[in-house]
Amino acid sequence: MSEFATPRAVFQRLIDGVTSRRPDGLPQLYAEDAVVVHPFARPASRLEGRDALREHFAQLETLPVEMAARNVVVHQTADPEVIVAEFEYAGRNTETGRDFVVPNVFVMRVRDGRIVESRDYAHHQAFEEAMA
């Protein structure tokens, strides 16, 4: 048995940390030189390295949201390092009471128990509208 967490387990830790809004441990899920791209963000964004990810995840603590991940489906691929995860963040803006559902598809490569690259296809506009 491998001493490293599986891609599926690492993904689960990621969405658990995001939905609980506990950002402190999230950067440690990533390799030092990890690259995360958000192709559907306006403008598209690219985060390189743990420091950039730490800054990105720190925003979770200030967001006025309660949310959960639902309809989670993780697909294994022919490459044992790569998974495709489909899911939704569903929640509520605690300041406005506005409900939201944000569909996501993450294509994630996990090597030695850490995310080395991820393409996160999220409906950023739906989240931005919920925060307005």
Residue spans for each PLM region:
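Short, surface-exposed coil-to-beta transition loops
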Residues: 68-69, 100-105
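Short, low-complexity N-terminal intrinsically disordered segments enriched in polar/charged residues
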Residues: 1-28, 32, 132
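Low-complexity, intrinsically disordered terminal/linker segments enriched in charged
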Residues: 117-132
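Short beta-strand segments enriched in hydrophobic/aromatic residues
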Residues: 30-31, 89-91, 106, 122
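A solvent-exposed, acidic/Ser-Thr-rich amphipathic alpha-helical stretch
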Residues: 4, 25-78
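A short hydrophobic beta-strand element
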Residues: 79-89
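Hydrophobic pocket/interface hotspot
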Residues: 14, 26-27, 34, 49, ...
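Short, cysteine-centered beta-strand-loop-beta hairpins and adjacent loop/turn segments enriched
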Residues: 62-63, 90-99
